[in-house]
């Protein structure tokens, strides 16, 4: 097919699911193998602070990375900095070409409940109610208090004796903290900035228990806008049976595991749900299929919702380079099988509270790293004869000693190779590429590889797959608007416009989904054009 296939045409393929069983591929244990012939490279280096999840550190060590030690390593001698708190502007400006940060700037527009509500309301007024009807009616307090009161009493008059239900959430808090569910306005209390939303009274129940979905989304860049959705995920259950007659029973109405793991029924074997309060997403979809539900259609609706949500805030993201971010989208399914966006979580929890967490989150972190640093360099080394005979299978743990590419997305980004082939005496080059560090070994090897590939380039014609160019060593994605730019010689900045890889591990590309959306996002976002393409897709 000419061009990247649409989500609608290849839903099963996009999500990597067979027609029957819909099993999700698990990350396999890593094994150690001998290094191939040639000068060995030291491991890549990750940097942490006190907020870095222990699971992230554990996974990186499993993959053969080293932990940064400021006492014995150069201040710039690291490749990945993963922490819970956001980075300062100076850290974004000074990030080096071989480094990655796990946050984009300006993400509160997506993860703060009041900011998200404002952006979605703006998109709804501009592009129509029907397109953005996946969020409940929302009021921001105290700004919208008068509007809310008017709506409350109008609805009360329309419904007569039938109650209406609302939920009030703090704009900045998570894990179910500070939430109030009410039907009587006299019970509404708030201090500070809150959002009040129409409470969804008809959730899809599993064995009479309410649940929601934690969908993991990774945004690897904003120029072009590049969104991946994880095939696996979590389904979180309330631990008491759903009952609108008792709005104060949070174990019945809230699905946050931080609350329900403390409930009296957490360890009990509950109807259908079983013990605990979590399922894997694949188990949930298997349950739906047993009731003749088209789970692929539901997945497709969720992917559209994610794209539309990110589009609401993407134009406001400042220019940054070498960043990525993992988000947790919380989605509730009602009894009409309509998905509703509840909120988007910054730093989704990576704690391991149960065996379901272990199976999902450990693979998730592995696949985030896989998404960022696939072993493309190792495959190129093999072409150049650097792999020892009989060692055609290379483990991920060892391949990461030599890898350093972004998603293998066949782009024309300026690479680390291109930057380091300039004059070694150039002060700018010396500043960007310090000598005698772990990463300096990597840069030197990449330079040798570049010279070899240049000699062989004329002998072979690259094979195209759909609209992707051949895989090559590339830079991480760029981002979008521009309050500031990275400093340094022109050669150290990635070019815009690379075509993303369609998957990595269990992550699948959901945007861009065709040539038109790629062109509409590679040099700044043409939101109107993207919306038009998405509407075509949704109307098929």
Swiss-Prot record:
Organism per entry: Mus musculus (Mouse)
Q: Name one Pfam family in it.
A: TTL
Which protein, by its recorded name, is this? Probable tubulin polyglutamylase TTLL2
| Record EC number | 6.-.-.-
State the Gene Ontology BP annotations. protein modification process
Q: What is known of its domains?
A: Arg-175 is the main determinant for regioselectivity, which segregates between initiases and elongases in all tubulin--tyrosine ligase family. A glutamine residue at this position is found in elongases TTLL6, TTLL9, TTLL11, TTLL13, TTLL10 and favors glutamate-chain elongation, whereas an arginine residue is found in initiases TTLL2, TTLL4, TTLL5, TTLL3, TTLL8 and favors initiation.
The entry lists its GO molecular-function terms as: ATP binding; metal ion binding; tubulin-glutamic acid ligase activity
Which family would the database say this protein is a member of?
Answer: Belongs to the tubulin--tyrosine ligase family.
Q: Which residue stretches belong to region Disordered?
A: 479-499
Q: Provide the cofactor list for this protein.
A: Mg(2+)
